[in-house]
UniProtKB/Swiss-Prot annotation:
It catalyses: beta-D-ribopyranose = beta-D-ribofuranose. Catalyzes the interconversion of beta-pyran and beta-furan forms of D-ribose. This is D-ribose pyranase. It comes from the Bacteria. One of its GO terms (cellular component) is cytosol. It comes from Pseudomonas syringae pv. tomato (strain ATCC BAA-871 / DC3000). Pfam families: RbsD_FucU (PF05025). The active site is at residue 20. It is found in: Cytoplasm. The gene is rbsD.
Length: 134
């Protein structure tokens, strides 16, 4: 059995397969998933699992170079934003970029995979760009 926090087989496989510059998205329950993009659906019910719990586990295994958020998130200020900002201050998320929600949906078409959470706070969506450990 694995010793690290991530136990989900599909998610572990995707993170292990990421190359430099690949995009992995963590999204709320309402974010559309484009055809052809792998969906790892973790959502069980409203709020389970929540966005922050999934982000914490993903960051335990993934090297992040940068991240992308929707500008609308800054207006709505869902609870996840405060956690993202603190992780950003700790340099765990690399460079931050803000784009429109529509542009984030367009960016999702290029994602290697999208992780759907049970999060139901609006605009709780994040694109993580894979970095390298060397």
């Amino acid at each position: 059995m694995k010793k690290t926090p991530l136990l989900n087989i599909a998610l572990s496989r995707v993170i292990a397969s990421l190359g430099h510059g690949d995009i992995l998205m963590i999204v709320d329950a309402g974010m559309p998933v484009p055809p052809g993009v792998e969906l790892i659906d973790l959502a069980l019910t409203r709020g389970v699992p929540d966005f922050v719990s999934v982000l914490d586990v993903v960051l335990s295994e993934m090297q992040v170079e940068s991240h992308v958020l929707a500008r609308e998130m800054a207006d709505i200020k869902p609870p996840a934003l405060q956690i993202i900002e603190s992780l950003n201050l700790d340099d765990q998320l690399g460079q931050q970029r803000w784009i429109s929600h529509e542009d984030l949906k367009a960016l999702s078409r290029t994602a290697k995979a999208i992780i759907r959470t049970g999060e139901c706070q609006p605009y709780s969506n994040l694109a993580l760009v894979s970095g390298v450990v060397f």
